[in-house]
Amino acid sequence: MSRKRDRSVNVTDGDLFKPMMVLSAPIVASQLLNVGYNLADTFWVGRLGGDAIAALSYAWAVVFLMISVGGGLTVAGTVLIAQHKGAGNYRRASHVAGQTLTFVTIVALAFAAVGYVLTPLLMDLIGAEPGSDAFAYAVGYTRIMFVGIAFMFWFFIFDALSRGWGDTRTPLYLMGISVALNVVIDPFLILGFQENPLFAWLGATGLESSLYAATGFGGFGVEGAAIATIFSRGVAAVIGLTLLFTGRVGLEPTLGDLRLELDSVRRIVDIGGPTATEQGFRGFGITVLTAVIALAGTEAVAAYGISTRLSSLLFMPALGLARGTETVVGQNLGANQVDRARRAVKLSSIVVASVFAVVVAAAYPFAETIAGVFIEVGTENADQVIEYAAAFIVIAGPSYVFLGVFQILLGGLRGSGSTREAMVLAIQELWVWRIPISLVGILWLGLGVYSVWYAIAISYVASALVTAAWFLRGTWTENVVDEGEEATTPTASD
């Protein structure tokens, strides 16, 4: 098969550190750009006040659950394609790409239908008070996200498949296009042409008045953030799938590969199911945690929303490096190079711990200033929200060094196909540590949202230590691909 445009990185031969960083750097950059969606939404929605920020927190708990399950299933595509490529089974890798696309799309459509209907009930269960502005905002935002879920999933699929092949640059370029679109249209879709501070910042106040007089468009409010996200994700998804089926990323799936085969679905579910379950439990856990924080008041929920955006600045890069490690481990185990796979995990752990230590130390003196960026000073309860969010940086910040190592170790396990072990270890962070400690602190110790910040710190440290102990046992190094069986399995194009 022709792969003239193949941009994949060779991580199975020669030096390891440099190609691994070359592979991982675009993923990290892509994850940082991904944070751009949340930061832009939070920044502009923050101009609408505390209820609007709280609505994003309520909505995100459900949205995160939705995309976590689909995202978990795409891990199977990453693992199988990485290991098939390492073993030299290129045709089979392309077949897996088609099967993953069809299966995850079906899951997305099912989620969209069910989620749209159940959104009001879910918001009520999380703790949003029916009849309140925050409840109305959250319902509108979440329903729009459900309507456009397929576009989000398609981009996640393209990203996962390209990553497994070893091409991380193409998804980065598409993410850049998507985020740029989102950043440009966010302020207009959220605030419209009336009382939009963007015009004042650009020195074009007169233009604002003229546009509003001509159109009468005052923005969609919180719902505008959802519309901007779905549109920008959709553009990237369509371009990505076009590149995939024209063979421009190395993989060459055919239309025949889109017809689901029972054996392929079983393999996807077997490998991706535990990660989807893990992400589902995590998403549900975030939902439960949001409901617990709601007991401390709207200001606490708003501060949690800001802390979530701030933490994503570190969590997403850690996840990006972990996904790069996932590919390196998968391809090297596919090539039966166990020691090289193990060394990749150790090198990534050192890199992430070192970088995070520097970033956290730099952020410490500016905690309150950083928190204040995400809410308009002078709006209702803004000072309280900023105080809570700044405390998050001070209390939980140092633990993110451990979070980084924790994510790398999980990435190594997933790359080997040990997704069940990764599932258990990932779930324990939230359900064994963070949620119980938060609940005790809020209900019995009276610490309010501060108990959540302490719970986050304890959970990251404890989980990193537990996962490191498991990793050192070395039982994760067996290759999940049966080379003889998979290399000879017929496909629609054979």
In which residue ranges do the predicted regions lie?
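Short alpha-helical transmembrane segments in multi-pass integral membrane proteins
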Residues: 1-22, 81-148, 197-272, 329-398, ...
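Generic alpha-helical transmembrane segments of integral inner-membrane proteins
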Residues: 24, 28, 32, 36, ...
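Transmembrane helix-bundle signature of multi-pass secondary active exporters and lipid flippases
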Residues: 27-79, 145-152, 266-331, 355-359, ...
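Helix-loop interface residues and adjacent transmembrane-helix termini in multi-pass membrane transporters
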Residues: 36, 47-50, 84-87, 164-165, ...
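Helix-capping/transition residues at the boundaries of transmembrane alpha-helices
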Residues: 45-46, 82, 163, 171, ...
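Small-residue-rich hydrophobic transmembrane alpha-helices
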Residues: 53-116, 152-171, 303-365, 403-422
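Cytoplasmic helix-loop-helix junction between adjacent transmembrane helices
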Residues: 127-131, 135, 145, 149-176
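Alpha-helical transmembrane segments of multi-pass membrane transporters/permeases
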Residues: 161-212, 223-226, 339, 343-352, ...
